[in-house]
Amino acid sequence: MNSVLGNQTDVAGLFLANSSEALERAVRCCTQASVVTDDGFAEGGPDERSLYIMRVVQIAVMCVLSLTVVFGIFFLGCNLLIKSEGMINFLVKDRRPSKEVEAVVVGPY
């Protein structure tokens, strides 16, 4: 029971003290550099290999998202182009050439 009370007062003293040593202990206490594995060796932050793998995965995800956006814009543009051609053809079918134009075209040949 006294050890628990002692630990609480140590922590309170750590944060209430104005000395640089107390601040240093508080910072060391809560960083990844102070994590100790079962073997007794301190484990640092993520190693180079895991950072490389994370970077490759990020690049792959960004490439897939970029391709999705590019193809989405492309197919949307194609769809709009097809619809506009259909509307133009609809308007062209409504126009009828006059019979005089046909007579002139057929005449000289």
Curated annotation (Swiss-Prot):
TM regions (residue ranges): 56-76
Record keyword rRNA processing present: no
Coiled-coil residue spans: none
Keywords from the UniProt entry: Cytoplasm, Glycoprotein, Membrane, Phosphoprotein, Transmembrane, Transmembrane helix
Keyword Iron-sulfur in annotation: no
A GO cellular-component term linked to this record: cytoplasm
Residues with attached carbohydrate: 7, 18
UniProt topology in membrane: Single-pass membrane protein
Positions of modified residues (Phosphoserine): 98
GO BP annotations listed: regulation of cell cycle; regulation of mitotic cell cycle
Main location: cytoplasm
Compartments where located: Cytoplasm; Membrane
Protein family (similarity comment): Belongs to the reprimo family.
Cited function: May be involved in the regulation of p53-dependent G2 arrest of the cell cycle. Seems to induce cell cycle arrest by inhibiting CDK1 activity and nuclear translocation of the CDC2 cyclin B1 complex.
Name of the featured protein: Protein reprimo
